[in-house]
Amino acid sequence: MNRIVGLETEYGCLTNDFPGTPSAITRVRDWIFRDQRYGLIDVHQRDWDEPAGNGGFLFNGGRAYIDMGHLEYCTPECLSLIDILRYDSAGDTILMNALKSMRLEREINFIRNNIDHY
């Protein structure tokens, strides 16, 4: 393949959040960056709709962040299809590990509802 490619996956979230508690998406983001330290959270605002602390870059070269109320995961730029599959699978694994570690796999469901490619 003579092209650099990557995927951006949006995850819809179904949850039983109660009023006054942090959102499930926020708790998962915090688990990724603060508890597990899988990457570095952004310390500066990236855009008008992406404030500081909204997400960050992962040590695998990808990016996880909250966009308009849903979690997104972007693979790093890749040169092969097998790398795209590996990094895309890594995003799903990170989410599954978060839910298992926080014992929320029965309370929260993430659904891959949109994939953009570039």
Language-model features: where?
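Histidine-centered divalent-metal-coordination microenvironment in nucleic-acid enzymes
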Residues: 114-118
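Terminal catalytic/cofactor-binding subdomain
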Residues: 1-112
